[in-house]
Amino acid sequence: MAAVGDHGSPDSYRSPLASRYASPEMCFVFSDRYKFRTWRQLWLWLAEAEQTLGLPITDEQIQEMKSNLDNIDFKMAAEEEKRLRHDVMAHVHTFGHCCPKAAGIIHLGATSCYVGDNTDLIILRNALDLLLPKLARVISRLADFAKERASLPTLGFTHFQPAQLTTVGKRCCLWIQDLCMDLQNLKRVRDDLRFRGVKGTTGTQASFLQLFEGDDHKVEQLDKMVTDKAGFKRAFIITGQTYTRKVDIEVLSVLASLGASVHKICTDIRLLANLKEMEEPFEKQQIGSSAMPYKRNPMRSERCCSLARHLMTLVMDPLQTASVQWFERTLDDSANRRICLAEAFLTADTILNTLQNISEGLVVYPKVIERRIRQELPFMATENIIMAMVKAGGSRQDCHEKIRVLSQQAASVVKQEGGDNDLIERIQADAYFSPIHSQLDRLLDPSSFTGRASQQVQRFLEEEVYPLLKPYESVMKVKAELCL
């Protein structure tokens, strides 16, 4: 039996985000192996650049470091950290143990944030690179859905009360528009990321200036060389000990905004499921309730809403962290950032995987939609009926009064008796309206009440959505599979 508290055992807590929800690729980006392997890569890049610029570092030392990037003794590192109470120095010693010839030049001139902060920036960049195509796929699936149903009339709702008609595709475009804004914001914040670079303990580069005997140009070159090796186009010119924690605010703000979009979309789907107009996918063997076998609960959408709320709250962490970074740095950030950055990305990853799964299997029930339209459309059509009567020679005021009385009677049947809306039957039975009886079918055609909805869908997809998705064409075929 595993000892109580062993990580990974059933006797120890594990984050559901990692163990239950998030994708393996996102979990790996925030794993210890990826983090500490990147630390070693950063030490190698630093040594290579220092050697190129003339410091006494041998090819043999460089090769030894290269050969041991993946040779990480996690047990030794944990023991060293317990002894030293310092995670970076624990890994300096652990790396040095398997690179004895290079041990003396590992971390030369650097501070802990050289590996810590630069690794975080690499992780943020790579995590954003994972989210971008996932969000693009969600938008693509919803765009297909919207295009297919661009002209399908449905009852609109304002205040969740019946309003004028729209189309199923046009409503979906409201969702897509928000997600397109999120995609643009994710891309912007990803492209705006800058490397911390090689800055020293308080950002002044004093240690490197000393190493290069006061040669400003070599210090600048060192910073640029390592930045280039890490794949960043530019580094911060100004830092304290850390990169400004405003970066974390920007990144998590975009993720929180994505959470708001997903929450709105999935709430709409849940409400439509209650109305029986639309459903998320429901597996053949899926059980909706342990007590009520008929239930078809929208559990995927509910999960998205649940996790989206968590994602929206996480932005408070970097806001408060940035506000308490006294002078060049305090350690108020460290423990908090270990939690909030990973949780934000694992949560965003989960809701995008889930929303893609939902969007790939949305089910629409046109007959239910049609029936609901029939219940409300007669009231909406009264103005058109009045106009038709006036054109046929009737009085607007007389017609308005007739319609008012018949509408109240029909509303009473619906609300007091639980019956169907029979306003049109009442109009058909009233001789006063005989001049337009033959026009009623045309006047009640739902498609005549949706305005330019279908044209708006087509233009929106062609002018805004498809161009935005073009860079992601090569990854569009990936399906979203949910285990739970």
Swiss-Prot record:
Keyword set, alphabetical order: Acetylation, Isopeptide bond, Lyase, Purine biosynthesis, Ubl conjugation
Any one Gene Ontology BP term: 'de novo' IMP biosynthetic process
Enzyme Commission numbers on file: 4.3.2.2
InterPro entries the record matches: AdenyloSucc_lyase_C, Fumarate_lyase_CS, Fumarate_lyase_fam, Fumarate_lyase_N, L-Aspartase-like, Pur_lyase
One GO molecular-function entry: N6-(1,2-dicarboxyethyl)AMP AMP-lyase (fumarate-forming) activity
Pathway: Purine metabolism; AMP biosynthesis via de novo pathway; AMP from IMP: step 2/2; Purine metabolism; IMP biosynthesis via de novo pathway; 5-amino-1-(5-phospho-D-ribosyl)imidazole-4-carboxamide from 5-amino-1-(5-phospho-D-ribosyl)imidazole-4-carboxylate: step 2/2
Position of the Glycyl lysine isopeptide (Lys-Gly) (interchain with G-Cter in SUMO1) cross-link: 415
Xref: Gene3D superfamilies: 1.10.275.60, Fumarase/aspartase (C-terminal domain), Fumarase/aspartase (Central domain)
SMART domains linked: ADSL_C
A GO CC term attached to the entry: cytosol
Location of N6-acetyllysine modifications: 147, 295
Top-rank taxon: Eukaryota
Catalytic site positions: 159, 289
Residues found modified as N-acetylalanine: 2
Keyword flag Lyase: yes
Residue numbers binding substrate: 20-21, 85-87, 111-112, 241, 303, 329, 334, 338
Catalytic activity: N(6)-(1,2-dicarboxyethyl)-AMP = fumarate + AMP; (2S)-2-[5-amino-1-(5-phospho-beta-D-ribosyl)imidazole-4-carboxamido]succinate = 5-amino-1-(5-phospho-beta-D-ribosyl)imidazole-4-carboxamide + fumarate
Subunit structure: Homotetramer. Residues from neighboring subunits contribute catalytic and substrate-binding residues to each active site.
Family: Belongs to the lyase 1 family. Adenylosuccinate lyase subfamily.
Function recorded in the entry: Catalyzes two non-sequential steps in de novo AMP synthesis: converts (S)-2-(5-amino-1-(5-phospho-D-ribosyl)imidazole-4-carboxamido)succinate (SAICAR) to fumarate plus 5-amino-1-(5-phospho-D-ribosyl)imidazole-4-carboxamide, and thereby also contributes to de novo IMP synthesis, and converts succinyladenosine monophosphate (SAMP) to AMP and fumarate.
Protein name according to UniProt: Adenylosuccinate lyase
Organism: Macaca fascicularis (Crab-eating macaque)
Gene for this chain: ADSL
